Amino acid sequence: MRKVEFLDTTLRDGEQTPGVNFSIKEKVAIAKQLEKWGIASIEAGFPAASPDSFEAVRQISAAMTTTAVSGLARSVKSDIDACYEALKDAKYPQCHVFIATSPIHREYKLKKTKEEILDIIKEHVTYARSKFDVVEFSPEDATRTELDYLLQVVQTAVDAGATYINIPDTVGFTTPEEYGNIFKYLIENTKSDREIIFSPHCHDDLGMATANTLAAIKNGAGRVEGTVNGIGERAGNVALEEIAVALNIREDYYQATSDIVLNETVNTSELISRFSGISIPKNKAVVGGNAFSHESGIHQDGVLKNPLTYEIITPELVGVKHNSLPLGKLSGRHAFVEKLKELELAFEESEIATLFGKFKKLADKKHEITDADIRALVAGTEIENPEGFHFGDLKLTSNADDTVTAEVLMVNADGEEVEVIANGKGSVEAIYNAVDKFFNQTVRLLSYTMDAVTDGIDSQARVSVSIENVDTGTIFNASGIDFDVLKAGAIAYVNANAFVQKENAGEIGKAVSFRDVPTN
């Protein structure tokens, strides 16, 4: 049975999601988890975009041991050079070169003829091949490109040395039948004495990304591209976890397998959710909170008698673990550290004291500390802003005029404290007015969402916010976790404002867009 490779582009295409801004440290942590999950290749970024993008690709390259690392490049030699430099430490480097090919892009964006684009493809894939053993080529907006011309494009890239041919449904335009036929036609008609691997790259604008990707696999695709949780611009990308589980459950139909370690799926999904600040919808396939819930009495009865009556995916398959022995108030440091190892949570030795201190505070509030509590505790530590001032504490006072006064304590790494006071019509407004007063920058709150990350009345809460830097239009997401939902919201808002502060200070610069028209 053939095996389908998985390329993850969460760190490149997934970061196109409005408000998602992974730090370099977060990107490396994500890459390590993706490798553990069984991803064959990680598209780590677009090295030519900015110094931060270059450095992220460089650090990820050095950190990977079994997974290939790819960098994106426009059909521009300087982009390919940037990929080469950033990927020098990669054990298995790959370069992904692309150019748009559809009529609308040829006429309005590139202002190039068909023949000129073929010449550009030949020149730049050849150049990339001179620096990399493995080159991937993508004709952007392939599904709106004339099929006969698309074959010419693909053949030109293959003749120039491309090993992987990616067929992007850039705007989520195609249908499963159409997309499957495109793959069938290209695979049957592309000529080469080397093995050429075709891959789908689907966006979900019409809600068909998963179906389209599976149609491509059914028609011969040997690699799939997508993101964890389906994050990405507009309606997002295909969710790789859905493809991995579909291939496992319907192996009989697709006659294909993968190297994805399915019981790492939930851990991978939750990590992306924490770092992106995007909560996983309850009804999300495979990893949503309701994926293994049954409201109907008939369904519940059936599941109790035999889970296969209404569950085609078992919780254990994707890594939903039943809680082992819980910790408690009397649990010591050793037991706590062993629990972190048991749950395979990443931590540095220097972080143990801080984590254990938070655990003891948690134990004072909860009788039993579950695995979910421990994961939330570590997650809360990870998403705090370690640089500059961060949220310390707050005090609220209700006033006679029905307003609320918030006293917010901000603390920096050196232990310096600053207290800011502000009023508001309600608790959240008062807290956020105080934070605004502290940062003294113009932002607009776009969204505020809350969900419970553990079970029970004493559950920890996660608040996710999205704010806009009014001066630049840039959107930033951030999250906060605490027993007190107001404190969780304060943490999230402070973290989001810290991103804005960095952008205003020039630490987050304007990156070159991979959609900018090449100058050569």
From Swiss-Prot:
Its cofactor is Mn(2+). It catalyses: 3-methyl-2-oxobutanoate + acetyl-CoA + H2O = (2S)-2-isopropylmalate + CoA + H(+). It comes from the Bacteria. It holds the Pfam family HCS_D2. The keyword Transmembrane does not apply. Its EC number is 2.3.3.13. GO terms for cellular component: cytoplasm. This is 2-isopropylmalate synthase. SMART domains: LeuA_dimer (SM00917). It is an enzyme of class 2 (transferase). Catalyzes the condensation of the acetyl group of acetyl-CoA with 3-methyl-2-oxobutanoate (2-ketoisovalerate) to form 3-carboxy-3-hydroxy-4-methylpentanoate (2-isopropylmalate). GO terms for molecular function: 2-isopropylmalate synthase activity; acetyl-CoA C-acetyltransferase activity; manganese ion binding. The gene is leuA. Mn(2+) binds at residues 13, 201, 203, 237. Residues 390-520 are annotated as: Regulatory domain. Its main location: cytoplasm. NCBIfam families: leuA_bact (TIGR00973), PRK00915.1-3 (NF002086), PRK00915.1-5 (NF002088). Pathway: Amino-acid biosynthesis; L-leucine biosynthesis; L-leucine from 3-methyl-2-oxobutanoate: step 1/4. One of its GO terms (biological process) is L-leucine biosynthetic process. The lineage of its organism: Bacteria, Bacillati, Bacillota, Bacilli, Lactobacillales. Homodimer. Keywords: Amino-acid biosynthesis, Branched-chain amino acid biosynthesis, Cytoplasm, Leucine biosynthesis, Manganese, Metal-binding, Transferase. Belongs to the alpha-IPM synthase/homocitrate synthase family. LeuA type 1 subfamily.
